[in-house]
């Protein structure tokens, strides 16, 4: 075509793109006719330079523009590969290049083309020449466009792939609004050698024009689908940064290209047939040539990488470096092409450094490539670095990778707008935001490559593609969770660049925080450890592993670290609790094990703990602020975790003031700084006087003031078994707690009461052992045995029985302190007997049938009954008439059979144990009563060594026989056998004394008269009798106490 020079027309321009092949005369004449018929249109003025033959247009494109139709048109008439004629234009410093894309989609040919072709990429080749009749006189050589892109794998975001080319919004017109309803376009391709000029650009010819893109007309509607909602002005700061750029806004709804001042270069265009484009657009195979590149809207640092022919997926340039390089390029009048994207009022700012491309893996590339055909992406894959320099191609795989990534990071528009705007504004004050996208990370060159799933790719999204993205939204979110590395690499940079990054906040909230341990801080004023009192130097920190207490003693600052595995108990005493202490601050209490004191001493670097006294085990912290319920619950949770780790289950339960005070109440003020500084002044406890402290704690001491005494007790009465019991306890409105009597010991009763001799005194302390779970002491045992034989046993049985004191057997078997005996010739049995010989000076035990000996061994009570000690062998007698019913009842228990009450005695028979069982089973055989000398062992637990006990008793009887009867008699296993009949057993570890008393009581009620073997006593008494025995004994003592009080008062 001929070179013409036309004046600049502000509102009309047209670019005619022709293939680099010979055109027929009819085609040329048609173009000349069109140009001559419309003098206001743009005329091509500069010849196009030759393009490389290896790069071809994939379809013939004819870019036309009319005054009213400012849309893209594609010429389908030329089906052959035609190489167009070069056209050049002269440079003019006063004019800018303007490229207007004429739409022919609304013609029959355009509609047909739109219906026939799928949404694939338009492919441009180096041979394509784009010319404009409105180009100024500047000669632009080698307007390079991007390589041909395979249709299936390309992104939909066409306008997002060329940031250096700015398209003016055409949605303001009716035709533009109709584009939204049409299917979205796929990504266009530009070749490195395609160059484009617009009258909006200045006429300076410096560098090569780049980033031109062919738009597929049946998909170009999406270019402005979002554009109607965005600003139509070019970033003001961008114009300041590019000193030679002349940015101008078209007032009409046409599409404009903003191109930096460049040196005169050839503007070539070429095309191929439309059928070839259609065939390639339907191709499903993924093929990439090294000369192709996909244009992605990225930052200037990425453009510089692309210019240097380095893959974008392998590194990310530094932000500072990028900005510096950008300024340098602008000062050198480097040619830069900006594609204004008319979507969502976003315009590219050349200074934006936060736009990052990422490095996708091969596996991700395969997975994401299926979405590429639905994405429209703008890329500034090429950019000139200095004057006269030409852009170079980049690996097409890099672009394809970038395209695939955008689908993963794509969110809905509301999320994108909300997240992107504050980030962009944080970097560019006063600048308008670019196209909205979700910035996953912000990184720099020095940080190295980042994962593709968090790349910050600015993109367009069609309605149809939006549906696909929404379906994969959950996949994108899960992908973010799998990339903790991204967050780590970018959190530092984003914090430096962005004052607020909601994306990082969202990602950090998604990341699990299971590594964080429970931690609680308290502000405290003082700490008390043994003799030390320290002032606070911070907060006490409590975790599962340690407790850190920073404090100061004199001029020494100490940070005590207590290992929680050595904690025994803890307590939190609020000021409102335990009003007896009158505390104004809460106290945090820790009790550590004694073996940890050495470690505490080492940390304190103090010789105060050299003695390792008991007071050093307690750590008291006086808190400054009241403890909230939330802090209290969190403290219990921490202690529960510690108790699980250390195995101290009691640690999970806090000690109350009443429970913890006995631990340190005996400490003097010299031993414990807490007693000296705190308790003495706050609680008014007399220092060093444990009894007075205890009296103050229990409110037992008399009031020190002159106020009227407020009643702190109440009377309780109880009726049981026809008897009344009276007790005193605290008021119901007071805090109920266990109270141990700490006053003077008071004698309640003497039994038997005077004037009977040998009375036994029972005090209030003895009543405590009658509580459930307590062992009965010897006083209660002796008292009740005396009570039984005096009150419960019959006179006949009393004459035949004798009960030793519970101290008898202990005295008999005790070890002698004096090793030298008066008579060394005495045997061991004689020595033992000598210890208790006075116990029977007024009684002859050999005149008794039953001798009861309470035995206590290893805190276990059981009963030994010496039966018929005066007999040398078993004797069978007739049942006495008076005891026939009792004996028959006993036999029914022994044999588990019933015997008639009117059973008559028969002649005396000497039967063995086996014969006795057979005669018992036969009702017609007459029965005899057996009196057998033996030692019965009635044990409810069978935990004692009964053989030693039996042997000791045999030896005692042998010596006692010699003393009393002055003859020798041997008590052996044959003539004094030991028997252990089956008796009711205890079901706990504390009722052995109760069972002993019940054995004696049952014996007196139902004595054993027939000692024929075997003796069965399993059903001697019901179990419920044992359950009430303690309370019965208590009531008995209180009843006797009241009786004796009345008797003494009268």
Curated annotation (Swiss-Prot):
The modification Phosphoserine is found at residues 11-13, 25, 373, 433, 443-444. Residues 1-28, 183-288, 304-365, 443-476 are annotated as: Disordered. Its EC number is 3.4.22.-. One of its GO terms (molecular function) is SUMO-specific endopeptidase activity. Keywords: Cytoplasm, Hydrolase, Immunity, Innate immunity, Phosphoprotein, Protease, Thiol protease, Ubl conjugation pathway. InterPro entries: Papain-like_cys_pep_sf, Peptidase_C48_C, Sentrin-specific_protease. Protease that acts as a positive regulator of the cGAS-STING pathway by catalyzing desumoylation of CGAS. Desumoylation of CGAS promotes DNA-binding activity of CGAS, subsequent oligomerization and activation. Deconjugates SUMO2 and SUMO3 from targeted proteins, but not SUMO1. Catalyzes the deconjugation of poly-SUMO2 and poly-SUMO3 chains. Has very low efficiency in processing full-length SUMO proteins to their mature forms. PANTHER family: SENTRIN-SPECIFIC PROTEASE, SENTRIN-SPECIFIC PROTEASE 7. This is Sentrin-specific protease 7. It comes from Homo sapiens. The gene is SENP7.
């Amino acid at each position: 075509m001929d070179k013409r020079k036309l004046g600049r027309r502000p509102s009309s321009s047209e670019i005619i793109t022709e293939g680099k092949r010979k055109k027929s005369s009819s085609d040329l004449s048609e173009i000349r006719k069109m140009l001559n018929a419309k003098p206001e249109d743009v005329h091509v003025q500069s010849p196009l330079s030759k393009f490389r033959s290896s790069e071809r247009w994939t379809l013939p494109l004819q870019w036309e523009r009319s005054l009213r139709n400012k849309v893209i048109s594609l010429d389908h008439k030329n089906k052959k590969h035609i190489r167009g004629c070069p056209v050049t234009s002269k440079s003019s410093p006063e004019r800018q290049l303007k490229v207007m894309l004429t739409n022919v989609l609304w013609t029959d040919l355009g509609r047909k083309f739109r219906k026939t072709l799928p949404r694939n990429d338009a492919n441009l080749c180096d041979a394509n020449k784009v010319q404009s009749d409105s180009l100024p006189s500047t000669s632009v050589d080698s307007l390079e466009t991007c390589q041909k892109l395979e249709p299936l794998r390309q992104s939909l975001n066409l306008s997002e792939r060329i940031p250096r080319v700015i398209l003016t919004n055409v949605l303001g017109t009716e035709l533009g609004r109709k584009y939204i309803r049409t299917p979205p376009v796929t990504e266009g391709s530009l070749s490195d050698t395609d160059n484009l000029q617009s009258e909006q650009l200045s006429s300076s010819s410096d560098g090569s024009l780049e980033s031109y893109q062919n738009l597929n007309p049946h998909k170009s509607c999406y270019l402005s689908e979002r554009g109607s909602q965005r600003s139509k002005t070019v970033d003001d700061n961008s114009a300041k940064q590019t000193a030679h750029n002349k940015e101008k806004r078209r007032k009409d709804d046409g599409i404009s290209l903003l191109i930096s001042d460049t040196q005169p270069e050839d503007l070539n265009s070429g095309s191929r047939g439309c059928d070839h484009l259609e065939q390639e657009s339907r191709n499903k195979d993924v093929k990439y040539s090294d000369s192709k590149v996909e244009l992605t809207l990225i930052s200037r640092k990425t453009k510089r990488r692309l210019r240097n022919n380095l893959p974008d997926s392998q590194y990310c340039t530094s932000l500072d470096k990028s900005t510096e390089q950008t300024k340098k390029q602008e000062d050198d009048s480097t040619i830069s092409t900006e594609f204004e994207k008319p979507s969502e009022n976003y315009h590219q700012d050349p200074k934006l450094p936060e736009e990052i491309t990422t490095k996708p893996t091969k596996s991700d590339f395969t997975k994401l490539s299926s979405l590429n055909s639905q994405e429209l992406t703008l890329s500034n894959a090429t950019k000139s670095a200095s004057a006269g320099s030409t852009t170079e191609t980049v690996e097409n795989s890099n672009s394809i990778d970038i395209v695939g990534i955008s689908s993963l990071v794509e969110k809905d528009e509301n999320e994108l707008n909300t997240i992107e705007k504050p980030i962009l504004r944080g970097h560019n004050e006063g600048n308008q935001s670019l196209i909205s996208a979700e910035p996953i990370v912000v990184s720099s060159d020095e940080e190295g490559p980042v994962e593709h799933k968090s790349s910050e790719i600015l993109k367009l999204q069609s309605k149809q593609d939006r549906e696909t993205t929404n379906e994969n939204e959950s996949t994108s979110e899960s992908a973010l969770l799998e990339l903790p590395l991204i967050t780590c690499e970018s959190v530092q940079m984003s914090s430096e660049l962005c004052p607020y990054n909601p994306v990082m906040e969202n990602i950090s909230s998604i990341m699990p925080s299971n590594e964080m341990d429970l931690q609680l801080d308290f502000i405290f004023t003082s700490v008390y450890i043994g003799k030390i009192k320290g002032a606070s130097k911070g907060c006490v920190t409590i975790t599962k592993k340690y407790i850190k207490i920073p404090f100061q003693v004199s001029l020494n600052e100490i940070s005590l670290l207590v290992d929680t595995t050595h904690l025994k108990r803890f307590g939190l005493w609020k000021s409102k609790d335990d009003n007896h202490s009158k505390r104004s601050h809460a106290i945090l209490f820790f009790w550590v094990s004694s073996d940890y004191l050495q470690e505490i001493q080492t940390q304190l670097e103090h010789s105060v703990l050299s003695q390792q006294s008991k007071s050093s085990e307690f750590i008291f912290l006086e808190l400054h602020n009241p403890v909230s319920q939330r802090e209290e619950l969190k403290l219990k949770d921490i202690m529960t975790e510690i108790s699980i780790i250390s195995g101290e289950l009691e640690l999970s339960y806090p000690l109350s003031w009443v429970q913890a005070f006995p631990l340190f109440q005996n400490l003097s003020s010299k031993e414990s700084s807490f007693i000296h500084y705190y308790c003495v002044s706050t609680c008014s406890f007399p220092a060093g006087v444990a009894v007075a402290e205890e009296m103050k704690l229990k409110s037992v001491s008399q009031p020190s003031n002159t106020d009227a005494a407020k009643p702190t007790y109440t009377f309780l009465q109880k009726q049981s078994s026809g008897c009344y019991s009276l007790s005193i306890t605290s008021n119901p409105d007071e805090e109920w707690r266990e109270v141990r009597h700490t006053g003077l010991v008071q004698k309640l009763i003497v039994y038997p009461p005077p004037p009977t001799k040998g009375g036994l005194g029972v005090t209030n302390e003895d009543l405590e052992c009658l509580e459930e779970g307590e062992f009965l002491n010897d006083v209660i045992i002796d008292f009740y045995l005396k009570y039984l034989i005096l009150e419960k046993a019959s006179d006949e049985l009393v004459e035949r029985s004798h009960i030793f004191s519970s101290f008898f057997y202990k005295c008999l078997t005790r070890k002698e302190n004096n090793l030298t005996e008066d008579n060394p010739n005495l045997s061991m049995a004689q020595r033992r007997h000598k210890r208790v010989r006075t116990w029977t000076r007024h009684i002859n035990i050999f005149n008794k049938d039953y001798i009861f000996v309470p035995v206590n061994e290893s805190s276990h009570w059981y009963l030994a009954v010496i039966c018929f000690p005066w007999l040398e062998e078993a004797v069978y007698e007739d049942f006495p008439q008076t005891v026939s019913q009792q004996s028959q009842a006993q036999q029914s228990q022994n044999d588990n059979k019933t015997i008639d009450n009117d059973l008559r005695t028969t002649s005396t028979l000497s039967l063995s144990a086996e014969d006795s069982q057979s005669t018992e089973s036969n009702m017609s055989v007459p029965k005899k009563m057996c009196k057998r000398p033996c030692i019965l062992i009635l044990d409810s637990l069978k935990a004692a060594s009964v053989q030693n006990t039996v042997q000791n008793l045999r030896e005692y009887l042998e010596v006692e026989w010699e003393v009393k009867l002055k003859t020798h008699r041997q008590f052996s296993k044959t003539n004094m056998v030991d028997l252990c009949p089956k008796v009711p057993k205890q079901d706990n570890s504390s009722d052995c004394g109760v069972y002993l008393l019940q054995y004696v009581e049952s014996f007196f009620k139902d004595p054993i008269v027939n000692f024929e073997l075997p003796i069965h006593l399993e059903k001697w008494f019901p179990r419920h009798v044992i359950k009430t025995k303690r309370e019965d004994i208590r009531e008995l003592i209180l009843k006797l106490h009241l009786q004796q009080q009345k008797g003494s008062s009268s």
